[in-house]
Design a protein with these regions (language model features):
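Catalytic domains of carbohydrate-active enzymes, especially glycoside hydrolases
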Residues: 15-33, 178-181
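Non-catalytic positions within long, well-ordered alpha-helices that form the structural scaffold/packing
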Residues: 20, 92-108, 179-180, 277
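Catalytic cores of alpha/beta
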Residues: 83-97, 170-177, 225-231, 292-299
Length: 306
């Protein structure tokens, strides 16, 4: 399975053509702190229309001899700094976007919730002392609540629960906890630090829990040195780490900074020689992020392994 992170906020919908041409199996709508209530409503309405149209798709598929294709639509639910009541409300709202798909044994669209802690600045300032004492809710809380709500019928039983993992910083115990809490698919951060990430993937693949889940390795579309540095910061790793310096040295040189072809090849090589070589990987999660990255996506993915 290959999924793609969709653009949201005032960029919502601007990636429709690129998404359609690249033949992704799933689309992930992030829950970002910069996306206010109005923009979040726009995302929800878009998803609602998408899944409601699935009924028409199924009717057409039923009359066709061609096998029906299934797309996974994933709505992210981030705890950020919300209290338990508001987090539960988000789970309920997001989960019920997929109500019209339930029950359906052969949907052309499946729904999933990606359960994450969130990364806004206010949360980051509290996380050094995170836990029950300061009341911050995390991805395990969301997974646990969503699982129970699904069991009680408060959200559709067909909704899958997804989680995230960072192979450069997370413990294997974190993976186990999330699987035990109900996660059945993981999206990882890019394995920029190859050996550190390889160790995490190999250890995870050897666990009993890995038998029950899909692991989609994160693939960015790097467009410049500055863009790579943004990603390293996002992944919570030091710019001065030996692995970070090694990775930066592999980028196209300054003379090629605006050479699109050189960056297309860099990204394709990262997929072939790093991301897709990790143990236990069952697919990829592509994250274009920028307009330039989006433009590269179709060409990079054309020859990428699936």
């Amino acid at each position: 399975m290959t999924t793609c992170e969709r653009r949201v906020g005032d960029k919502l919908g601007t990636d429709d053509s690129a998404f359609a041409r690249s033949s992704f199996d799933g689309e992930v709508y992030p829950d970002l702190p910069v996306v206010g209530p109005g923009m979040a409503h726009d995302i929800d309405e878009r998803i609602r229309r998408r899944v409601q149209a699935a009924g028409t798709d199924r009717a057409a598929a039923a009359s066709s001899s061609a096998p029906a294709t299934t797309t996974v639509v994933v709505r992210t639910v981030a705890a950020q700094c919300l209290d338990a009541e508001r987090v539960i409300s988000k789970i309920r709202t997001s989960g019920n976007l997929f109500r019209c798909l339930d029950p359906n044994p052969h949907p052309t669209v499946r729904g999933a919730l990606l359960c994450v802690s969130g990364g806004d600045a206010a949360r980051a300032s509290k996380e050094p002392t995170s836990g029950p004492a300061n009341g911050l809710k995390d991805s395990r809380f969301i997974l646990g609540q969503a699982y129970e709500m699904r069991e009680r019928g408060e959200i559709p039983g067909s909704v899958d629960l997804w989680a995230v993992a960072n192979p450069m910083t997370d413990s294997v115990d974190s993976f186990r906890w999330k699987v035990d809490a109900g996660a059945r698919c993981f999206l990882t951060q890019p394995p920029f630090f190859r050996e550190r990430s390889r160790s995490w993937f190999e250890t995870v693949a050897a666990t009993d829990q890995a038998r029950d889940v899909d692991i989609l390795v994160g693939v960015p579309m790097i467009t410049s040195l500055r863009n790579l540095e943004f990603w390293l910061d996002l992944c919570g790793v030091s710019q001065d780490d030996r692995e970070a310096r090694r990775l930066k040295s592999t980028l196209p040189n300054v003379a090629q900074e605006t050479d699109r072809a050189a960056y297309i090849e860099w990204n394709a090589k990262f997929i072939r020689e790093t991301a897709w070589t990790m143990a236990g990987v069952t697919g990829m999660h592509v994250m274009p992020v920028t307009a330039s990255g989006l433009q590269m996506t179709e060409e990079v993915m054309r020859d990428a392994p699936h």
